């Protein structure tokens, strides 16, 4: 079977994975309304192409936090890649490095940070942090990340408690997972996921100044969906926002990411960069997100589908397919560079 689009990879990955792993990757919170709406919301947006423009040369390159990437298509933080491929995040990191894009490594990576860096020493890496109640543990982890050459700290906001993921509860998957980077990097010190001290439930806006005091890295806040929180992010001098609902895995029945993007972009008034994850499956989706103000998009589940199908090569193929589709979408709407993508290219359908 030829795999020519991201949904092909999804179908093929389902055949490769155990039921519990499929459920872990695909599952949403409660009734999965938000998970599904993340995808459906893109289809409620229509394109307004412009013609008679010279598109013989189309350039997909852009920058995030001052670093050039080959296309505005990067890899979102997802945990436990070894569930779907033996060397897990190391394969993901190598694919991202080869593609010339950014990979956000998760706190819940199944490979150590050191091994990921060794696998892809030249790659652009950010680190996603679930804030632990133990501030010293957070500090040690952030300092470790900084010393390893990660270029930004992404703090996840939307997980003060875990969402109600019914499949994971039924499958008791957590008992088979370990957390490598919440202990010493020495081998053998990983702890079971289900024994982990909970993620901090007391994190608040005033705590951001402490993080800013211990690192020189740009701080990106992941999980913002409202203009009120976007305005607070600017007020607290962070460097970026990822508009995200955690792939519909946390609070169900919230806004689709693409539906929340417009108000967040309007609220920050160009003062900080805004990114998006959730629901991107085609090059048109990438174009729509950029037209509505995202600097780039981050892929979650599709990366795991590629990894499950073919490891590093599967992730490369997923990234290549989406980048080629985006290149085509740019050409067919008259955009020769990412800078030419703007709000006039889209309208919200009345259907």
UniProtKB/Swiss-Prot annotation:
Pathway: Lipid metabolism; fatty acid metabolism. The lineage of its organism: Eukaryota, Metazoa, Chordata, Craniata, Vertebrata. A motif (Microbody targeting signal) lies at residues 349-351. This is 2-Hydroxyacid oxidase 2. A 2-oxocarboxylate binds at residues 130, 165, 249. PANTHER family: 2-HYDROXYACID OXIDASE 2 (PTHR10578:SF149), S -2-HYDROXY-ACID OXIDASE-RELATED (PTHR10578). It is found in: Peroxisome. It is an enzyme of class 1 (oxidoreductase). Homotetramer. The active site is at residue 246. Oxidase that catalyzes the oxidation of medium and long chain hydroxyacids such as 2-hydroxyhexadecanoate and 2-hydroxyoctanoate, to the correspondong 2-oxoacids. Its role in the oxidation of 2-hydroxy fatty acids may contribute to the general pathway of fatty acid alpha-oxidation. Active in vitro with the artificial electron acceptor 2,6-dichlorophenolindophenol (DCIP), but O2 is believed to be the physiological electron acceptor, leading to the production of H2O2. Is not active on glycolate, glyoxylate, L-lactate and 2-hydroxybutanoate. SUPFAM superfamilies: FMN-linked oxidoreductases (SSF51395). Its EC number is 1.1.3.15.
């Amino acid at each position: 079977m030829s795999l020519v689009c991201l949904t092909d990879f999804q179908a093929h990955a389902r055949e490769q994975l155990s039921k519990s792993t499929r459920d872990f990757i695909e599952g949403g919170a409660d009734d999965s309304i938000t998970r599904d709406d993340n995808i459906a919301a893109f289809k409620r947006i229509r394109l307004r192409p412009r013609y008679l423009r010279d598109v013989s040369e189309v350039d997909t390159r852009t920058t995030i936090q001052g670093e050039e990437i080959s296309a505005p298509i990067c890899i979102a933080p997802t945990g436990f890649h070894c569930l779907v491929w033996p060397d897990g995040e190391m394969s993901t990191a190598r694919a991202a490095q080869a593609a010339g894009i950014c990979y956000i490594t998760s706190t819940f990576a199944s490979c150590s940070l050191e091994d990921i860096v060794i696998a892809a020493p030249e790659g652009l890496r950010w680190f996603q942090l679930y804030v632990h109640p133990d501030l010293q543990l957070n500090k040690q982890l952030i300092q470790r990340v900084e010393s390893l050459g990660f270029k930004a700290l992404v703090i996840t906001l939307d997980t003060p408690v875990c969402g109600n993921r019914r499949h994971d509860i039924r499958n008791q998957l957590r008992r088979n997972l370990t957390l490598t980077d919440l202990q010493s990097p020495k081998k053998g010190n990983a702890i079971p996921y289900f024994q982990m001290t909970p993620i901090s439930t007391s994190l608040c806006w005033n705590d951001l100044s402490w993080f800013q005091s211990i690192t020189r890295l740009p701080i990106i806040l992941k999980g913002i969906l409202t203009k009120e929180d976007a305005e607070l992010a600017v007020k607290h001098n962070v460097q970026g926002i990822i508009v995200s609902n955690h792939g519909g895995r946390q609070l169900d029945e919230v806004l689709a990411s693409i539906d929340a993007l417009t108000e967040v972009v309007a609220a920050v008034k160009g003062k900080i960069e805004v990114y998006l994850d959730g629901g991107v499956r085609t090059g048109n989706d990438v174009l729509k997100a950029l037209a509505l103000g995202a600097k780039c998009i981050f892929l979650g589940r599709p990366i795991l589908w590629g990894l499950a199908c073919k490891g590093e090569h599967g992730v490369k193929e997923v990234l290549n397919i989406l980048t080629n589709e985006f290149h085509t979408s740019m050409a067919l709407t008259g955009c020769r560079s990412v800078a030419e993508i703007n709000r006039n290219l889209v309208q919200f359908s009345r259907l």
